[in-house]
């Protein structure tokens, strides 16, 4: 069913990120302001040389006029997109549009570069510069923000490294897997408890006897069925495994850390609850925090509220001083003045000297 105009208007007016015009968005990005400035200068040179060449008696390639007009339109659109901070929304358009402009300019350069006269030489120099800039734009805007070249270029921007849609999608996918895994743990706990209860009832064990869920065990440390009752009837083992089950149900995110492949994900008496994790190592974002030093100092540019679904993030206020141990990647490991340790987004803070934070 096609929605009415009123419903469509209500959908458009729904909750979404609103972007306001700000020239600082363009000026604060060295890559954007430099490439756009060079393109505008090259465009003026091309236009002047083309007008001067068209007054000569010699023929002038007419298709070049359309390339000049198209390049001017592309420059105007890019300035608007940057001023409204819509670059991440239109990266595909900018990349494809720059590719088309690259073809137009290289075609014009082929027709002008071998022509005689200083006027056509100026026009050919302008279209060659435009072709180079367009090729750089295709390479930059065609790549993800997490690519090495984009991260290096964005590191000079006042806004910092832009968030990566690919990495964000990967994190959301892992969080959905975390929720599914926690539900599977709860279902497995209930099934094994019911199975063990049925076994005890079948063997004539008192119904009021405390039983142990196998979720907290490896399930393979005792393969002798004759010794099952002696292990399960231990009061210490009952209490320990009940606590493990409660901890897994209350903290499914922490439980997921120990559920990766080729890693023992169950708690035993010998491990004492200390298991390894590989999901954080794979992402490069989440890892166990030890007693490592924090040699860098950073000041919060904006306030940040940690995600409740991610136990590794920490919140901070604007202007707060943080100690940082690793400045590689989009998430940095940091330590607050209160001693709280966690990860923070790098584009919300600015590195400073130690004496500046005093």
Curated annotation (Swiss-Prot):
A GO biological-process term: signal transduction involved in filamentous growth
The species this protein was found in: Vanderwaltozyma polyspora (strain ATCC 22028 / DSM 70294 / BCRC 21397 / CBS 2163 / NBRC 10782 / NRRL Y-8283 / UCD 57-17) (Kluyveromyces polysporus)
Pfam families with a match to the protein in the record: SH3_1 (PF00018)
Localization (cell): Cell membrane
Entry GO MF terms: MAP-kinase scaffold activity; osmosensor activity
Annotated Gene Ontology cellular component terms: cellular bud neck; HICS complex; mating projection tip; plasma membrane
Residues exposed to the Cytoplasmic side: 1-30, 84-88, 142-358
Regions of this protein lying in the Extracellular compartment: 52-62, 107-120
Protein name: High osmolarity signaling protein SHO1
Gene designation per UniProt: SHO1
Organism lineage string: Eukaryota, Fungi, Dikarya, Ascomycota, Saccharomycotina
């Amino acid at each position: 069913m096609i929605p009415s105009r009123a419903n469509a208007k209500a959908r458009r007016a729904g909750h979404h990120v609103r972007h306001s015009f700000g020239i600082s968005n363009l000026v604060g990005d060295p890559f954007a302001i430099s490439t756009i400035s060079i393109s505008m200068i090259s465009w003026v040179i091309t236009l002047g040389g083309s007008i001067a060449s068209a007054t000569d008696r010699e023929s002038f390639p007419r298709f070049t006029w359309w390339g000049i007009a198209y390049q001017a339109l592309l420059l105007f659109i890019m300035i608007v997109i940057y001023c409204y901070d819509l670059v991440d929304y239109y990266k595909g358009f900018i990349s494809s549009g720059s590719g088309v402009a690259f073809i137009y300019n290289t075609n014009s350069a082929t027709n002008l570069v071998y022509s005689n006269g200083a006027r056509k030489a100026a026009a050919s120099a302008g279209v060659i510069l435009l072709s180079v800039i367009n090729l750089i734009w295709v390479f930059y805007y065609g790549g993800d923000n997490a690519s090495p070249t984009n991260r290096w270029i964005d590191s000079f921007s006042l806004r910092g490294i832009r968030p990566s849609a690919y990495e964000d999608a990967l994190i959301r996918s892992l969080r959905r897997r975390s929720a599914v895994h926690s539900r599977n743990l709860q279902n497995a706990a209930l099934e094994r408890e019911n199975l063990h209860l049925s076994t005890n009832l079948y063997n004539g064990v008192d119904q009021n006897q405390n039983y142990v869920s196998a979720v907290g065990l490896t399930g393979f440390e005792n393969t002798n069925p004759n010794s099952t009752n002696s292990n399960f009837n231990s009061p210490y083992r009952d209490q320990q495994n009940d606590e493990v089950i409660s901890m897994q149900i209350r903290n499914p995110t922490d439980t997921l850390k120990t559920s990766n492949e080729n890693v023992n994900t169950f708690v035993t008496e010998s491990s004492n609850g200390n298991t390894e994790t590989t999901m954080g190592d794979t992402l490069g974002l989440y890892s166990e925090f030890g007693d490592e030093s924090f040699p860098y100092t950073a000041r919060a540019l904006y306030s940040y509220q940690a995600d409740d679904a991610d136990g590794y993030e920490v919140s901070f206020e604007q202007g707060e001083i943080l100690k940082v141990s690793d400045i590689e990647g989009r998430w940095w490991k940091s330590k607050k003045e209160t001693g709280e340790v966690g990860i923070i987004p790098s584009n919300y803070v600015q590195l400073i000297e130690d004496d500046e934070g005093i």
